[in-house]
Amino acid sequence: GLNHETAPLSERELLKRLGLSHHAGEGLFFPDTYLFKKGTPDILIYRLAHDAMMARLNAYWDDRDPGLPYKNPYEALIMASIVEKETAHPADRDMISGVFVNRLKAGMKLQTDPTVIYGMGKKYRGKIRRIDLRTDTPYNTYTRYGLPPTPIALPGREALEAAFYPAETDALYFVARGDGTSHFSRTLDEHNKAVDKYIR
């Protein structure tokens, strides 16, 4: 197996050892299968995974649509992490990204539950309550505008591509149908009808 030399390090110490200035490691390492020799120091795998993520991010950034509302590749990584957590249905990723891009451009709050859950940390018990949506944390996109301060998950290639190449859509809302897919709406009235149909 690996030589686990980073085991005693805190997250911040690990990032410092890797020469990174980020405060959180979430999302900075590309999820993939990495081959290594027995006894390889784990720091090398972290470095390889980080380099793989940065290479992908920078390639997508150089090829991006100039109209995207991201100030830098890290903001696109944050968006990709939200898309990753928001759906397990691959066909919906581009549309969900398109909705969030539209909301950012319109100055609307993202209002996405996975960011609230991430901000709750260990307080999350499997269900979000109304009070949780009103309790402000740096990650609560119901109480704060814009993107959260860091990624909330490790996005895969499909979520990264969705963040950089979102669907062109007029939709501003979506709701889970219960079968893993989402229903998209252009107006709040349409969205409320969809919520009545699929949730209530």
Where are these regions (language model features)?
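Bacterial extracytoplasmic/cell-wall-associated proteins, especially those involved in peptidoglycan
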Residues: 2-9, 15-200
